[in-house]
């Protein structure tokens, strides 16, 4: 079932866009890779198998993969290229013990036209050809879809017609980050992202929006909603 009896015509997701209209953005797939070894006292490391050393080999392969990603996946004209980043590593229990476990977390940004699980499988195949010991690729704990501009063009134009009189000329753009717009769009509701403020201030210690831009955005939201029919 659905929560709404009538499907909305359009969703405008309020995020800081500098009053531009985001019509496309990248998605994200995140997962863990784990290596195992054999613990022993660090005074005789040859008695064990160092899981961090094993992970270092995987990290070198992932860096190689990230460098080649621009050739493997064509960049999107609005959102730029696909990326891969290792953002977290954890391993070992003490400095005098050879570690028997190591875990990393991977962030793979996908561009419109890519699927999250395909990106995961692509990395798995790349590592399989290069790594000769056992490791675990844990199923992704996040697969966030992209937002494509194939369904929202008409609505973006209509929203723009209310932006220009209030705030002057602005643009339809693509961005590297993701938003909830992709989830709404996946549900069959054409979606765009629009709001006051800059993404440069998002997730910082001092988030702020200028009063003028906030007032302009409020007027644009009102005019668009009042005339959407």
Where are the predicted features?
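Acidic/histidine-rich catalytic neighborhood of metal-dependent amide-processing enzymes
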Residues: 1-30, 229
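Metal-dependent amide/peptide-bond hydrolase catalytic core
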Residues: 23, 30-229
């Amino acid at each position: 079932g659905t929560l709404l009896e009538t499907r909305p015509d359009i969703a405008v997701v309020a995020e800081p866009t500098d009053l531009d209209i985001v019509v496309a953005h990248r998605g994200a797939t995140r997962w863990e890779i784990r290596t195992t070894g054999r613990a022993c006292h660090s005074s005789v490391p040859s008695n064990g198998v160092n899981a961090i050393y094993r992970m270092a080999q995987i990290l070198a392969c992932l860096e190689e993969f990230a460098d080649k990603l621009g050739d493997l996946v064509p960049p999107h004209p609005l959102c730029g290229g696909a990326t891969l980043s290792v953002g977290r590593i954890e391993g070992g229990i003490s400095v005098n013990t050879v570690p028997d476990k190591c875990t990393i977390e991977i962030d793979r940004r996908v561009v419109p036209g890519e699927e999250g699980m395909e990106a995961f499988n692509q990395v798995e195949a790349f590592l399989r050809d290069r790594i000769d010991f056992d490791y675990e690729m844990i199923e992704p704990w996040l697969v966030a879809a992209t937002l494509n501009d194939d369904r929202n063009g008409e609505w973006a134009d209509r929203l723009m017609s209310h932006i220009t009189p209030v705030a002057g000329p602005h643009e339809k753009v693509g961005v590297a980050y993701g938003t909830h717009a992709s989830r709404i769009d996946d549900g069959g509701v054409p979606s765009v992202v629009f709001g006051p403020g800059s993404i440069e201030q998002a997730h910082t210690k001092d988030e702020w929006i200028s009063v003028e831009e906030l007032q302009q955005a409020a007027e644009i939201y009102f005019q668009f909603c009042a005339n959407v029919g």
